[in-house]
């Protein structure tokens, strides 16, 4: 099964956050790379806690960051 994890930048809080409704998962971090690693650790744990099969499992990360430049 594939789980899509949406990652976005919160400019006000100055953090990256990740949300996945199918796992369920909601995490945040100051570092994009650290957030990816946290997701890879937390996803199987959350799947197990919610009695979902953790394996085989694929995570698809979709990231977005918007900036005002003018």
Regions found by a protein language model. Name each.
Residues 1, 21-23:
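Short strand-coil-strand connectors
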Residues 1-6, 33-70:
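Short, charged, surface-exposed hinge/linker loops at domain edges
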Residues 6-8, 28:
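Generic structural detector for well-ordered beta-strands
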Residues 8-21:
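Short aromatic-glycine-(Arg/Gly/Cys) micro-motifs in beta-strand/loop hairpins
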Residues 15-17, 28, 37:
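Short acidic, gly/pro-rich beta-turn/loop elements at beta-sheet edges
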Residues 17, 24-25, 69:
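Amphipathic alpha-helical interaction segments
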Residues 23-34:
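A short, exposed loop/beta-hairpin motif centered on an aromatic-Gly-Thr core
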């Amino acid at each position: 099964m594939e789980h899509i994890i949406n990652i976005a930048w919160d400019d006000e809080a100055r953090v990256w956050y990740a949300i996945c409704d199918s796992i369920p998962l909601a995490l945040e971090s100051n570092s994009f790379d650290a957030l990816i690693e946290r997701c890879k650790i937390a996803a199987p744990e959350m799947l197990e806690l919610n009695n979902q099969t953790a394996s085989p499992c694929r995570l698809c990360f979709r990231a977005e960051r918007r900036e005002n430049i003018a």
